[in-house]
Every structure is written in structure tokens, then in C-alpha cells.
């Protein structure tokens, strides 16, 4: 359910369930695939950078119901997948997401060009896997 709560320092946070963020008749299949991507990544790397890749894939693939911000997505992932130890902090992953989707160079300079290239590649690969669920003729 869409819920707005007063956050720290007076910021309003929007809380949305992951299932409500996803567009299509394949919500359960997409959620399952997102969990697979997350589980596979977390076997080898505890970093939350996978969340930036998944969110970029969803946004670039047109698989969300609205134009959500990264923080809303991060909160939805923490709520949906509590067993994966997704950190409460989101600053680095949010900066990485913004760098991945940026068309110009207006991103956080603490993110290296190599991290951005790797992030864009992962996001594209994940996007194709997610789109193949919605439309098997995609790839």
C-alpha cells in the first residue's frame, strides 16, 4: 500500500510494496526473478550495488508502474526480502543508480567510470532477463 511517512529530518518517505511497483501481468514471475538475481549476487558479494542494477533494469525496461525514486525501491526491497540483509543505508547504491541511468556526467564523482560501466552492463543483462519473462520473444 502506498504510504507517506515523516522521515528523519522532516523528509517525507513514500513506502510502496515491490509488487505494486511492478507493471505487467507477470508480477509474481518478476518478483521471483528479482529474488533469484538478488540471491545469486549475495552469494558472492554483500554489497547492495545489485539493487542499483536491478532498479536501473526495471526503469530502463519500462517495468514499473510509475517513476519511483531509488529510496522508495530500496525500502520496498528491504521489506520484501528481509533475509538478504539489505542495508538501511542507501547513499552509495543510490549514487550508483543515478550514475548508471545518467546520460551525461551529472553523477557522484566518487563513483568510478569502471563502476559505472560494470553497473550499466549488469543493468542491461538483468533488464533483458526480466523482459524475457514479460515477453519471451524479447531476446
Regions inferred by a protein language model and the residue ranges of each:
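Flexible coil/loop and intrinsically disordered linker positions at secondary-structure junctions
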Residues: 1-139
